[in-house]
Amino acid sequence: MKAQELREKSVEELNTELLNLLREQFNLRMQAASGQLQQTHLLKQVRRNVARVKTLLTEKAGA
């Protein structure tokens, strides 16, 4: 997910995206803890996407 794609979304869409990412992050962490996760790079990707969305929400709140 690119930052430019996220910038085009509204605050409501960003909140929905954040909720989906947090759910995905939780599921990935559970898979990793149980040893079922093969693609460990997904944890890093999702964590950074969460940070991107939170950053944009903060920017939009200030503007």
UniProtKB/Swiss-Prot annotation:
For this UniProt entry, the molecular function terms from Gene Ontology, in alphabetical order, are:
structural constituent of ribosome
Q: Which GO terms describe its biological process?
A: translation
**Statement: the UniProt record of this protein carries the keyword Ribonucleoprotein:** yes
List the CDD domains: Ribosomal_L29_HIP
Origin superkingdom: Bacteria
How is this protein annotated for GO cellular component?
cytosolic large ribosomal subunit
Which controlled-vocabulary keywords does the entry list? Ribonucleoprotein, Ribosomal protein
Give the protein family.
Belongs to the universal ribosomal protein uL29 family.
PANTHER family named among the record's database cross-references: 60S RIBOSOMAL PROTEIN L35/50S RIBOSOMAL PROTEIN L29 (PTHR10916), LARGE RIBOSOMAL SUBUNIT PROTEIN UL29C (PTHR10916:SF0)
What is the designated name of this protein?
A: Large ribosomal subunit protein uL29
- List the taxonomic lineage: Bacteria, Pseudomonadati, Pseudomonadota, Gammaproteobacteria, Enterobacterales
Underlying gene: rpmC
